[in-house]
Amino acid sequence: MPFDVILFDVAGVLLTNGWDRGERAAAIAHFHLDLAAFESRQLAPYDAWERGWTPVTDYLDATVFYEPRGFSHDEFFAFMLSQSQLQPDGALGILKELAASNQYLLGAFNNEPRETNEYRFQRFGLRELFQVTLCSCYLGLRKPESAIYQQALGILGRPAERVLFIDDRAENVAGAEAAGMKAVRFEGEAALRRELEALGVF
C-alpha cells in the first residue's frame, strides 16, 4: 500500500459548507437581519468558535443577539444546522469504499466549530467511517496554518510521506504538501477516483 493514512476534508469534499457565505446569507434573509452588519461582526468570533475557544452561544451573542430579537438562540442555530447537505458530486462513496476495505487508517482533517462538527458527523454517519478526527475545534489551529499539519502528523504517529490528504482548497493542499504529505485537490468524485487509482490506493 502506498499510504498508511488517508485524511479527508469534510466541507466541500463530503458535505456542503455548513456556514459559508451562502449559508450565512440564507439565515440572515430567513430571520430578516442585516447581512452587512452581520458580516462586519462575524470574522473574529467565528475564528474563535472554529478553533474551539468559545461555544456557539458566544458566537451568536456577538453576531446576532447583541440586541433583542424575536427568536431564540436555539431557533437560529437550528436553521444553521439545516444548511448542511451532502456535497453534490462528493467523495462520500469513495470514503465508504475505503472504509469497507479496512486497508487504511481513515481520518477527518477539517476546519469546523465543535457544535456543527458533532452534528454533521452524527447526521451523515461520518463517525462510523473515520477512526480519527483532526478538527480545528479540537486542535485550536486551522488549516492552512503550518502548525496544524505538524500537530496532525504527531497525533497520527506516521511519517508524512505515508499520509494522503484530500481537500478542495488549494491553500490547504499546499500546506499539507509543505509538511511532506501527499495531497490531492478534490475536484469531483470521478477525478478523485482517477487520482487514487493512479496513486495505487484502489
Which residues fall in each region the model found?
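A metal-dependent, Asp-based hydrolase signature
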Residues: D47-F77
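Generic structural signal for small/hydrophobic residues in well-ordered secondary structure
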Residues: D9-G12, G52, L98, A108, ...
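Alpha-helical elements of Rossmann-like donor-binding domains used by nucleotide-donor carbohydrate transfer enzymes
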Residues: G22-A26, A44, D58, A62, ...
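Asp-based, Mg2+/Mn2+-dependent phosphohydrolase catalytic module
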Residues: M1-P2, P113-F202
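Short, surface-exposed acidic
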Residues: F31-Q42, P68-A78, F202
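Short, acidic loop-to-helix structural element flanking the phosphoryl-transfer center
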Residues: F71-G107, E118, S146, E189-A190
